[in-house]
């Protein structure tokens, strides 16, 4: 059982990464990754929101939607859970760290529309995961998001100090870098055999 959880954890971080493999969450990936500080803040915020949403969505799914045969309302319910969770988290971040709140800017409310935040509870529902698997799936997927965001932002900081040809400055070199990072993560594909 422990090995199952370990494989789930490692595969979601490295092999089935939401950004580089499933191409979910590309808006904050490209938008907030200019500096490492904002990437760390966004990664932590997204991790907290995803874990909280995974817990609440599993509880609502298991205790309300399934028993009352309302599973067809899961997408709408999860969207509501995400919106409320992000608003709560935004209030907490504003109170705790006004600097982080200003750094994240528009991207903090945009966690609401981050498709990876919605994909995780939907996949938990589809996979019929138990509570521990759901929380671990959410946590490990968000750690994979966080890892790629921090790696990409550190690379972008180095690129911003480099002499890049004029036509490649900005998003073109960022997309090329992201594709090379995705190719590098493809090397983890054979790491786990099920």
Swiss-Prot record:
Keywords: Cell inner membrane, Cell membrane, Electron transport, Membrane, Translocase, Transmembrane, Transmembrane helix, Transport. One of its GO terms (biological process) is electron transport chain. The chain crosses the membrane at residues 1-21, 48-68, 73-93, 103-123, 135-155, 172-192. The keyword Translocase applies. GO terms for cellular component: plasma membrane. It holds the Pfam family Rnf-Nqr. It comes from the Bacteria. Belongs to the NqrDE/RnfAE family. NCBIfam families: PRK05151.1, rnfA. Part of a membrane-bound complex that couples electron transfer with translocation of ions across the membrane. The complex is composed of six subunits: RnfA, RnfB, RnfC, RnfD, RnfE and RnfG. This is Ion-translocating oxidoreductase complex subunit A.
């Amino acid at each position: 059982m422990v090995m199952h959880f370990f494989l789930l954890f490692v595969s979601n971080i490295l092999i089935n990464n939401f950004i580089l493999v499933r191409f979910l969450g590309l808006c904050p990936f490209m938008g907030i990754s200019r500096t490492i500080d904002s990437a760390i803040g966004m990664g932590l915020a997204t991790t907290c929101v995803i874990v909280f949403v995974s817990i609440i969505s599993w509880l609502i799914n298991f205790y309300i939607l399934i028993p009352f045969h309302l599973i067809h309302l899961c997408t709408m319910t999860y969207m509501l859970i995400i919106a409320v969770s992000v608003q709560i988290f935004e209030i907490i971040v504003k109170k705790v760290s006004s600097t982080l709140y200003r750094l994240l800017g528009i991207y903090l409310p945009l966690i609401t529309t981050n498709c990876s935040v919605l994909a995780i509870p939907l996949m938990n529902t589809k996979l019929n995961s138990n509570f521990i698997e759901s929380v671990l799936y959410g946590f490990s997927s968000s750690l994979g998001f966080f890892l790629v965001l921090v790696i990409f932002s550190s690379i972008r900081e180095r690129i911003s100090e480099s002499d890049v040809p004029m036509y490649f400055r900005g998003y073109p070199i960022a997309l090329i870098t992201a594709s090379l990072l995705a190719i590098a993560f493809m090397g983890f594909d054979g790491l786990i055999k099920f």
